[in-house]
Amino acid sequence: MSMFGRKKRKPLRQLITHKEPKSRVTEQYRNIRTNIEFTSVDNHVRSIIVTSADPGDGKTTTIANLAVVFGQQGKKVLLIGADLRKPTIQNLFAIHSSNGLTNLLSGQAKLMQCIQKTDIENVHLMAAGPIPPNPAELLSSRGMDELLLEAYNMFDIILIDTPPVLAVTDAQILANKCDGIVLVVRSEKTEKDKIVKAKQILDKASGKLLGVVLNDKREGKEQYGYY
């Protein structure tokens, strides 16, 4: 999986792959997309969880920009906000929706009421919706399985933003429901033992780790490897 170069923090609404499509960072996102495609030559990967070991590692910004570069490739993308505890994915696309994943899984809304077209070509968003009292139970429900089955008929690729692996069980619950997982770590912040622990947890949950994205890489430093 590709490693990022160092990049300055951007406002949440600033999607660099959309705003600066010729930038070096955007090219790194395209490299990540290519690596994901290479991993799916024999086993077609259509649903991908993007998560992290800890909060603040950049998973949500990473998944949003991945959605953009897949959309730029002409693929119809569904981005699902499955971080039901601290949902922020909708902020990056400046979308405010009354319906989202929690409304769908709790039977309060239909699928098409919960999917919105973003301003970016080919990219659709299902926001998290209202914060529920039982996130893990909703994500492990039959409704989540049915959502994925329906989405496979409508979209080329499904990207799912989840809470950090070490914080709660949500990513583990979804791990074996999806085709692959991308783990985001932040350079000089995420501790090595936490990365190893996160991988062990995902392996135990029968998840397929596609690779690790190293975020905020400083030039001149030795690069991390990836799983």
Go through each PLM region and give its residues.
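P-loop NTP-binding module
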Residues: 1-227
